[in-house]
């Protein structure tokens, strides 16, 4: 931690700080030793813990589903095969009910989004001190100061991760809009709606207003996707940290909050997936 006996503020700040690698203007290339150093590294700094856990959990998801696909049987399926089939059927039904286009990419994309975000959210149930303390001990073996070893284990509590996923969805929204309506149709949607007039001069005057409203609506989609997921998981992680600080009573409270938090973990993954499907369905609709 920030010391042998950290204050409550230091304890919280330490748990909410990412392991940041980047180019510091004074210290050169390396790991940040404080939140201020991480900030001074600027935009191109990398959160190693977020990258590591998100990629690792993504690989775990791919390996798990590939293993089930390779060992699938037509007889009595095992528990894991039942679970995977249930997940695939659930997501497929959600896509069929919500997406009205013809793309075959949406169902596997939705399955990937739901499972990947669910696994990242699930890391919030790991005891808050376990992996950070393990990282500190490993850092000490390599000669690092344990007080300056930061390690966050929930990728979705990092706004950079949630914003990165939402920007990928935003890029797909633009792609499907242009593919479905053409570039001219996409631009017309941005400039000729919601207000229109039969008089060409009046319509020309309305173009900036329409563009401003439609641009705000379009940009609000990835921002709301990112901040909703980040805010809910960040708040959940903060509550776990606060519970860990109260001593003897932390175990029953931790269990109670973890039980409730399972609903949040699942619900937020589902909401992100469903909104992605809805946005992509809207992008393919022609007005």
Swiss-Prot record:
Q: Name one GO molecular function term.
A: proton-transporting ATP synthase activity, rotational mechanism
Cellular component terms, GO, for this chain's entry? plasma membrane; proton-transporting ATP synthase complex
Where is this protein localized, as stated in its record?
Cell inner membrane
Pfam families tied to this protein: ATP-synt_A
The membrane spanning regions, by residue number, are 45-65, 106-126, 158-178, 238-258, 260-280
Q: Which GO terms describe its biological process?
A: proton motive force-driven plasma membrane ATP synthesis
Q: Write the record's keywords in alphabetical order, separated by commas.
A: ATP synthesis, Cell inner membrane, Cell membrane, CF(0), Hydrogen ion transport, Ion transport, Membrane, Transmembrane, Transmembrane helix, Transport
* UniProt xrefs under SUPFAM superfamilies: F1F0 ATP synthase subunit A (SSF81336)
Cleavable signal peptide: none
Assign the protein's first listed, main location to one coarse class. membrane
Q: How does it sit in the membrane?
A: Multi-pass membrane protein
Which family, according to the similarity comment?
Belongs to the ATPase A chain family.
* Subunit and interaction comment: F-type ATPases have 2 components, CF(1) - the catalytic core - and CF(0) - the membrane proton channel. CF(1) has five subunits: alpha(3), beta(3), gamma(1), delta(1), epsilon(1). CF(0) has three main subunits: a(1), b(2) and c(9-12). The alpha and beta chains form an alternating ring which encloses part of the gamma chain. CF(1) is attached to CF(0) by a central stalk formed by the gamma and epsilon chains, while a peripheral stalk is formed by the delta and b chains.
Q: What does this protein do?
A: Key component of the proton channel; it plays a direct role in the translocation of protons across the membrane.
Under which name does UniProt file this protein? ATP synthase subunit a
Q: Which gene encodes it?
A: atpB
